[in-house]
């Protein structure tokens, strides 16, 4: 799969994990996967892994399934196909989440964009109050168009409050 694509002599997942390990604030970086081949590659490159089941609808369910095993209050989900993720970007996200007075359950960073036809990127639709209403690769459903403030591009990193992630997993399985 895509995570094992060779980039300059190393699989994409290794590049992504090594970039995450450069973060000042992440104590541990784990690759959560159901693939024995990915686990083998990660172990060879000194990257911690957690073996998961195969039957998940999305990456959030996969991360949520292992959240109880991780002794942290905040869990950062970095998609495995982000080999150019900037460690400073991860650090900024962690700082925002830990310093926020209301301690949000989830922070999904995005980039403002004006594209609407590209189905390869995840769109983030925000309400007029700034709350996320919709995340999807699909085009914006017509019924939402009058209620949205902007369409943004999701940047493949999400910060979760661990308790919220565990609750999500319990209610969506």
PLM features per residue range, with description:
Residues 1-33:
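N-terminal glycine-rich phosphate-binding loop and ensuing alpha1 helix
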Residues 10, 35-36, 87, 162:
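Alpha-helix N-cap/helix-start capping motif
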Residues 19, 23, 75, 106-107:
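Structured catalytic cores of enzymes that bind and process phosphorylated ligands/cofactors
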Residues 30, 36-95:
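Short phosphate-binding loop-to-helix
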Residues 27, 73, 103-105:
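Conserved acidic residues
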Residues 85-172:
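Conserved core of the sugar-phosphate nucleotidyltransferase
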Residues 5, 39, 166:
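Nucleotide phosphate-binding site architecture
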